[in-house]
Amino acid sequence: MSASTTATLRHDWTLAEVKALFVQPFNDLLFQAQTVHRAHFDANRVQVSTLLSIKTGACPEDCKYCPQSGHYNTGLEKEKLMEVQKVLEEAARAKAIGSTRFCMGAAWKHPSAKDMPYVLKMVEGVKAMGLETCMTLGRLDQDQTEALAKAGLDYYNHNLDTSPEFYGSIITTRTYAERLQTLAYVRDAGMKICSGGILGMGESLDDRANLLIQLANLPEHPESVPINMLVKVAGTPLENADDVDPFDFIRMLAVARILMPQSHVRLSAGREAMNEQMQALAFFAGANSIFYGDKLLTTANPQADKDMQLFARLGIQPEAREEHADEVHQAAIEQALVEQKSSEQFYNAAV
């Protein structure tokens, strides 16, 4: 199968086709992925995002990989919903170190009615700084997606995690169909989709292929596809899972690039365990987005200065961002404070 034929957008991939991509010689796969990548992106630019946990721990879901699940004793301290001012201060810091997108994550099964007004103000404030906005809040209903879109949310993250066949071995508190329904609501509301999965949970090659097929065969490809390598956390059921072979991880990125040629493929969780050579291979395979900063929700991430040093050595530049003066950042923070104090719909999230 030539690179030129896979550079077109398809939504009808079969398991046989995708497995054939996975098992071809490594150099052939990377050549094909890089060729597709260059047809749609500047191969020497990477989109940079920062992820902030706005509500940590005590999640009612039982995802076996997650240290935030209330089902497991991981030593993670529960934190309540962060206040708007603090979120906007963190967003300003993220932009100052080069992020173009600010992602906010809450450890919920779904956001409650009392939380939504607060979350919407976060979106509005971050958007006012000129940053792209992204949130991951769990399952959404149609009204919630429409409210987030109206507030200016650009991306909603809702990962499929793995294949439909393997999913029940990892999560029992939310169905695969519910995840797909949330993605449909997000798309119908006019927002962009961020959705991917995790390697290293005991899944098979078929499972990895079927995860990518689920994503690539959606009516529209996700604009962002995060590929995570399991971060093994003591206290979770997967703390002793086998390591992912580095070449298998690179193959996953390359096949994702070929199947979804116009999507940003994000090198996401697990990057702390990757050496510079593996990260360089990931970029060559078509990864063109990273999370930037010292922490990814609750697990370590390479330090920001190390990322910039690696970019410099590889000749990679962060994607361009919209510039706003410091006064705009401060005005957004101050406006959020005024609205929070004057509106009776807000509650003290620190209590």
UniProtKB/Swiss-Prot annotation:
Cofactor detail note: Binds 1 [4Fe-4S] cluster. The cluster is coordinated with 3 cysteines and an exchangeable S-adenosyl-L-methionine.
UniProt binding sites for [4Fe-4S] cluster: 59, 63, 66
Binding site for [2Fe-2S] cluster: 103, 134, 194, 266
Catalytic activity: (4R,5S)-dethiobiotin + (sulfur carrier)-SH + 2 reduced [2Fe-2S]-[ferredoxin] + 2 S-adenosyl-L-methionine = (sulfur carrier)-H + biotin + 2 5'-deoxyadenosine + 2 L-methionine + 2 oxidized [2Fe-2S]-[ferredoxin]
Keywords: 2Fe-2S, 4Fe-4S, Biotin biosynthesis, Iron, Iron-sulfur, Metal-binding, S-adenosyl-L-methionine, Transferase
Enzyme class: transferase
Superkingdom: Bacteria
SUPFAM superfamilies linked to this entry: Radical SAM enzymes
Cofactor: [4Fe-4S] cluster; [2Fe-2S] cluster
Pathway: Cofactor biosynthesis; biotin biosynthesis; biotin from 7,8-diaminononanoate: step 2/2
Record carries keyword Chaperone: no
UniProt GO BP: biotin biosynthetic process
NCBIfam families: bioB
Family: Belongs to the radical SAM superfamily. Biotin synthase family.
PANTHER family given in the database record: BIOTIN SYNTHASE (PTHR22976), BIOTIN SYNTHASE, MITOCHONDRIAL (PTHR22976:SF2)
Protein known as: Biotin synthase
Taxonomic source organism: Pseudomonas fluorescens (strain Pf0-1)
Lineage of origin: Bacteria, Pseudomonadati, Pseudomonadota, Gammaproteobacteria, Pseudomonadales
Name of the gene: bioB
